[in-house]
Amino acid sequence: MLLSLLIIIPFLSSFFSFFSPRLHNNFPRWIALSGIIATLLVVIQIFFQENYHIFQIRHYPNWNCQLIVPWISRFGIEFNIALDGLSIIMLIFSSFLSIIAIICSWNEIKKNEGFFYFNFMLVFTGIIGVFISCDLFLFFCFWEIMLIPMYFLIALWSDKTEKKKNFLAANKFFLYSQTSGLILLSSILLLVFSHYYSTNILTFNYNLLINKPINIYVEYIVMIGFFLSFAIKMPIVPFHGWLPDIHSRSLSCGSVEIIGVLLKTAPYALLRYNLVLFPDSTKSFSLIAVFWGIISIFYGAWIAFSQTNIKRLIAYSSVSHMGLILIGIYSNNERALQGVVIQMLSNSLTVAALCILSGQIYKRFKTQDMSKMGGLWSCIYWIPGFSLFFSLANLGVPGTGNFIGEFLILSGVFEVFPLVSILATIGIVFSSIYSLNVIQKIFYGPCKQNIKVFFINKQEVWTIIALVFTLVFLGLNPQKIIDVSYNSIHNIQKEFNNSILKIRS
C-alpha cells in the first residue's frame, strides 16, 4: 500500500492544485509542497521499514518492496512498481530538489498558479514513476507523461519579455522528447516481441526479460534504440540542442526541475535497463560509448567557456558532466558505477544551486549576459560567496560530493580504460577554466552598472544553505549513500557479468 502512495499522492496533488484557486490563490503552492513532502515521508517510511538493501543481496531482482497489479493482461502488461537501494536514493533526492524548486517558485509564479502547479506535480509524478517502474510499458508511460506538462512549464512560465522564443524553446524540447519516446517505444516492442517468439510468453515484466537470450543482432538494435532514447534526454553531444535553449528561457524553479531532476532519469535508465537487459551488446558497444563520453566532456567544456549567457553556460556545463557519467556507466567497473550515483546526486545539487543563484542575479539586473556584469562582489551580500563555493564544487574541489563522484569514476575507469581515464581527467581540468571565468566576469573587475548594495531574502538564503550542507555531507560522508546503493549497484554489475558468461558459454 505504501508503494502505491508514491504515485497516488503526487498525482492527486496535481488535480487538487488545479482546482484549489477557486478557494484561495495560495492553495496550489501549499498543496504541491504538501504533496511532495508527503511523498518524501512515504519514501523515508519505506526506507526504515523494509530493510530492502539487506534483502537485495540474495534475492535480486525479486524486490522486497514490490506491488504488482494486473493491468492489460492480454498483452502481458502489469502495474508493476518496486524499490531497491538505487531507486530509493533517487526518490529522496528528487523529492528534496522538487521541494527546493517549489520554494523558488513561491515569489516567481503570480498568474495561473493552479495550472502551473498542476503541470509541476505531473512532471514530478512521471519522475517518481520512472524510478520505480518494473514493467517496460509502464516505464514508457511515465517517461512520456512528463512531456506535455513540461512543455507548458517552458512555454508559459519563462522569460516574459520574449514569449515567441519561449514557445520556440518549448517546441524544440517537444520534438526532441517525442523523438526519444518514439525510439524507446519501438525498441520496447521489438524486445518484447523477440522475447515472445523465443519463449512464447508475451510480457513487459522487467524481471522476466532479464537473462532471456534473444538474437544477438536484434539485441544490438534494441540496445542502440534504448541508448539513443536515453542519450537524447541526458543529453549528450550531439543531442543536446534543446537543453541550452530551454534552460536560458526557464525560471529558476523550472531550471532546478529540468537540470536537477529530470535529466537524471536518463542515466538511471541506462544503469537499470541497458546494462542488465542487453549485456553482450552493451559490452561490445562500451568502447564507443566511453569515447562518445569523452567528446561530450570536451565539447561541453569548450562551448561553456565561450558563452556569455550565464544560464547557457550552466547548461553546457551539465552536458560536459553527463559525458563523465556516461563513461562511468559503460566502464564495466563497480567502483565507477558507485561514482556515477554520487556524481548524479552532486551534480544535481550543484547545478540546482547555480540555477537559483543565476536567477537571483537576473531578477535584480534583468540580464543573463556576463559581459554586462562585473564588480558585483561589493554590491550583493551572500550571492558571491555561494557562487564561488558552487563553482568550486562544480570543478570537483575536495570536501564536496562532486570530488568523490569524479574520483570514484576516474579511478574505476582507469582499471578498464586507462587512456580514457587520463583524457577525462584532462577534460575535467577545462571545467576549472570556465567555472573561475564566470566568477571573474560577474563578481570582480570594475562595476558596470550603477546599483545599490542589497541583501537577498531569508527564503533564498536558507534554500542555498540547505544545498550547501547536503553537498558537503555527500563530500564528507559518501559512505551513507554507498551503503544504501551498494547492493543494487553490485547486483547490476553481477547480472551484467553473469549474463555475458551465460551468453558466451
From Swiss-Prot:
It catalyses: a quinone + NADH + 5 H(+)(in) = a quinol + NAD(+) + 4 H(+)(out). The keyword Transmembrane helix applies. The chain crosses the membrane at residues 30-50, 86-106, 114-134, 136-156, 173-193, 221-241, 251-271, 285-305, 313-333, 373-393, 409-429, 462-482. InterPro entries: NADH_Q_OxRdtase_chainM/4, NADH_UbQ_OxRdtase, ND/Mrp_TM. It is found in: Cell membrane. GO terms for cellular component: plasma membrane. One of its GO terms (molecular function) is NADH dehydrogenase (ubiquinone) activity. Coiled coil: none annotated. GO terms for biological process: ATP synthesis coupled electron transport; electron transport coupled proton transport. Its EC number is 7.1.1.-. It is a multi-pass membrane protein. Keywords: Cell membrane, Membrane, NAD, Quinone, Translocase, Transmembrane, Transmembrane helix. Composed of 13 different subunits. Subunits NuoA, H, J, K, L, M, N constitute the membrane sector of the complex. PANTHER family: NADH-UBIQUINONE OXIDOREDUCTASE CHAIN 4. NDH-1 shuttles electrons from NADH, via FMN and iron-sulfur (Fe-S) centers, to quinones in the respiratory chain. Couples the redox reaction to proton translocation (for every two electrons transferred, four hydrogen ions are translocated across the cytoplasmic membrane), and thus conserves the redox energy in a proton gradient. Belongs to the complex I subunit 4 family. This is NADH-quinone oxidoreductase subunit M. It comes from Buchnera aphidicola subsp. Acyrthosiphon pisum (strain APS). The gene is nuoM.
